[in-house]
Amino acid sequence: MNFDQKGLKKRSITVAYFFEHIQKRFDIKFRRLNELDEQKCRIHERDLHRPGLAIAGFTKLFTYKRVQILGNTETRYLNHLSDEERKTAFANFVSFRMPCIILTSNNKLDQELVDMATGAGIPVFITRCSSTKTIYYITDFLDEEFSLYQQYHGSMIDVYGVGVLLTGKSGLGKSEVALDLIERGHGLVADDVVVVKRKGETKTLVASRNNIIDHFMEIRGLGVVDVRQNFGIRAIRDRKEVQVVVELLEWSKESEYERLGLDQKMVKLLGVDLPLVQLPIFPGKNITAIIEVVALNFLLKHYAGYVPAEALTERIRNVINKERAKAPAPSTSFEEYNDEND
């Protein structure tokens, strides 16, 4: 598997996509105040803007390409102005080509001002949520939409709560191993095509499935398996953080494989370092059980700081030190030295 693939990133999303999907993903509802072709309005930035200064007339540093949030402060400022001042201030505000305007806390906007936004081709939405809650949800949504992402060939499994990305050359049996893990009670996130996203500037990688393939698996010799229908809702996961990468390798006598586990290999995915476990495949090897142990070892190290290889090494070192302490010290007296040289 090529781990060096560069991450991809969306350049923009439509306001129509934003309006539809954010309400599905979060506990927030929006209502349209005007009717426009939202497919033509696009959001290019993940950051939001509170345009208080811009409404007041200072537009020198106005980041108008962002989603504009009008909360209590902005709407009350507009309401305290006279009719002519309000029209002038809002006309100046909507003269900039912004993606959309969102009113929070059910704040009202005069219909005349809404019509001005409609004339400028700017969608206006309203929500009952507070500005703080609205900004939190929208930022989280846009953060994910504009995150780095890449598609990897493999399987993503939730094993004992640990996100394991199973990779390797085609034909080595990744799907069969994943199916065996599902039968043992673990959860399938994705098979064949795994979509991995790096959330914002964090070191967190989140894996999800391809929406077309969904939770179907292709098993050679058997055909297509619907994991959800065959094993029930417990056998699938919507998304999972990638915590360990397991690479299946063809067995080779010439190759040297890790035997103790003291040297932890790492692999970089989308700029994030992850532990890599390479497992050679040969007849009679129970890969499923080994992957379960890989997950348990990760939990031991993550929560208890315990590494079996280091514990065994320390035990051997202690035994050697005890044996050395029991052995009689060699004599180095001056008389014995002279006797030996007479």
From Swiss-Prot:
Mg(2+) binds at S175, E218. Residues 217-226 are annotated as: Important for the catalytic mechanism of both phosphorylation and dephosphorylation. Catalyzes the ATP- as well as the pyrophosphate-dependent phosphorylation of a specific serine residue in HPr, a phosphocarrier protein of the phosphoenolpyruvate-dependent sugar phosphotransferase system (PTS). HprK/P also catalyzes the pyrophosphate-producing, inorganic phosphate-dependent dephosphorylation (phosphorolysis) of seryl-phosphorylated HPr (P-Ser-HPr). The active site is at H153, K174, D192 (proton acceptor), R259. Its EC number is 2.7.11.-, 2.7.4.-. Keywords: ATP-binding, Kinase, Magnesium, Metal-binding, Multifunctional enzyme, Nucleotide-binding, Serine/threonine-protein kinase, Transferase. ATP binds at G168, K169, S170, G171, L172, G173, K174, S175. Homohexamer. This is HPr kinase/phosphorylase. The keyword Coiled coil does not apply. Residues 280-285 are annotated as: Important for the catalytic mechanism of dephosphorylation. The Walker A ATP-binding motif also binds Pi and PPi. Both phosphorylation and phosphorolysis are carried out by the same active site and suggest a common mechanism for both reactions. It catalyses: [HPr protein]-L-serine + ATP = [HPr protein]-O-phospho-L-serine + ADP + H(+); [HPr protein]-O-phospho-L-serine + phosphate + H(+) = [HPr protein]-L-serine + diphosphate. GO terms for molecular function: ATP binding; magnesium ion binding; phosphorelay sensor kinase activity; protein serine/threonine kinase activity; protein serine/threonine/tyrosine kinase activity. It comes from Chlorobaculum tepidum (strain ATCC 49652 / DSM 12025 / NBRC 103806 / TLS) (Chlorobium tepidum). InterPro entries: HPr(Ser)_kin/Pase, Hpr_kin/Pase_C, Hpr_kin/Pase_Hpr_N, P-loop_NTPase, Ser_kin/Pase_Hpr-like_N_sf. It comes from the Bacteria. The lineage of its organism: Bacteria, Pseudomonadati, Chlorobiota, Chlorobiia, Chlorobiales.
